[in-house]
Amino acid sequence: VIYVFIIRSLEDVEDLVLGATILGTGGGGSPVEGFKMLKEVIDRGLEIRVVDVDELQEDSVIVSPYYVGTIAPTAKTRKPIKISNTIREAFTAMSRVLGKRISAAIATELGGGNTAVALRIAAELNIPVVDGDLLGRAAPELHQNTVHIFDLPMYPSVLVTETGNIVIVERYADIDDYESIARYLSILAGRFVAVVDTPLTIDNAKKAVVKGTISLCMKIGRAVRKARESGEDPVEAIVNGLNGWKIFEGVVAKYSWGDEGGLPYWRNLC
């Protein structure tokens, strides 16, 4: 397998998490937690190998690991923690459900937390992570996911809470019911539920994957870091890196946020 790149340094981790946070546009989990996850990977001497989906073997199976829940400061675990690595527990259960080894992981979305989730579990299990995701940014609901758009199933699915619930969804009635199941489990646990779903064949992955987005996260994060180091405008670095436009600028004078139905809500005053 020819890798697009391999992440071995904390500087690469910082660039990737920063870029994913920017491209997540406000969602996608906590970048603080994302950096912590990947720092642990680097500190353990593990490698994060990023691969183009076209480089994987035709019989490969790809799955998507992520968290559903809230990063609102009011969220708290409701019961004692029984499962420390919920994503790994879900990954192991998914492999058992499928009856085969999982070949690679893919980020469900871009964001400081959820992109890091896929990279961490891939490094821990010594499998590659696909250079891409299933959304192209972060989003609050599964409706925006490319798998749903292409009418591909996200089941079977495994959902695990740190409080000890392990739920296997063999099939769901519709995407709204599935979303509700995941949100309810996150509320039941108090903070989040770990999810591993969307087992993709290579043919289906080639339809659904938004290619190159992990590379793009690295590019944007690196551009911002270098702009800061040289005293240049980091916003201009983002605009130039994405061929975008700066619509307005201002200062956030006040903000408040909280949790409603397993989703974070916030209000900003500029």
Locate each region found by the language model:
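Glycine-rich oxoanion-binding loops at beta->alpha junctions
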Residues: D54-S103
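Conserved anion/nucleotide-ligand pocket segment
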Residues: T163-T213
